[in-house]
Amino acid sequence: MQEHIADMFGIEERLKEKGISVDSMVTSAMLLYVPHGLSAEEATHKIREKIIRYLRDPNVASLLLGAILLEDELYLRQKDSGIQEDPVFLISDEIIGMAIAECIGGTYARFEFTRYDQKKPGILATLGPFLDDAVAGLIAGCTSRLYSECC
């Protein structure tokens, strides 16, 4: 039942429509990977598995859907909304990213989210204010969980 709910959101397909593939997220994750007893090849494989798994989690999927819809509305449709440059007063995007990270990796993932949010490796540098933080949260949650499982 849980997978069916997440699948009805079509998150992986919606992200692909925005130019965000699983491969691009894995590549971005590996740009800030901190070796933890796994080879880069092993870590890449495990991060890919985690990203795919958590794209199907209904809580993560619904937060990602929220970020997609907010970005479509405020960044693309309402071009005079003032959020194109990710203004300081806009914090809901970070809240979504942190929530995704914590859903997956717990409190430690919040710190991992900060690394990805600040450095914006790979695909993150090309995304708007909501999707960069939502995808950073997904990556951070998955890498944080990987680090806690392998150490």
Residue ranges: model-predicted function:
Residues 8-12, 82-83, 87, 121, ...:
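A near-ubiquitous, low-amplitude feature marking generic local secondary-structure context
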Residues 21, 26-28, 61, 70-71, ...:
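A generic structural micro-environment signature
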Residues 104, 108-151:
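Glycine-rich, aromatic-bearing surface loops/beta-hairpins
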Residues 27-31, 65, 96-106, 137-144:
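Short, hydrophobic/amphipathic alpha-helical patches that form generic packing surfaces
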Residues 4-68:
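N-terminal interaction modules that seed assembly of large macromolecular complexes
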Residues 44-116:
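Long, charge-patterned amphipathic interaction tracts in eukaryotic proteins
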Residues 4, 18, 40, 44, ...:
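Intrinsic-disorder-associated interaction segments
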